[in-house]
Swiss-Prot record:
Superkingdom field: Bacteria
Keywords for this protein: Ribonucleoprotein, Ribosomal protein
The name this protein goes by in its record: Large ribosomal subunit protein bL36
Residues of the signal peptide: none
GO cellular component terms given for this protein: ribonucleoprotein complex; ribosome
SUPFAM superfamilies documented for this protein: Ribosomal protein L36
GO MF annotation terms: structural constituent of ribosome
Family: Belongs to the bacterial ribosomal protein bL36 family.
Species whose genome carries this gene: Corynebacterium jeikeium (strain K411)
HAMAP family (alphabetical): Ribosomal_bL36 (MF_00251)
GO BP field: translation
Length: 40
């Protein structure tokens, strides 16, 4: 999982979901797991 300042480019990938957990924003992608990221 990467920690990124901006998730905009990742959320446009096919299969990406934006999720809020414990006050943090995550992008999870079951199709391409290397695009997992947290905003921070």
């Amino acid at each position: 999982m990467k920690v990124r300042k901006s998730l905009r480019s990742l959320k446009n990938k096919p299969g990406a979901q934006v999720v809020r957990r414990r006050g943090k924003v995550y992008v999870i992608n079951k199709k391409e797991p290397r695009f997992k990221a947290r905003q921070g």
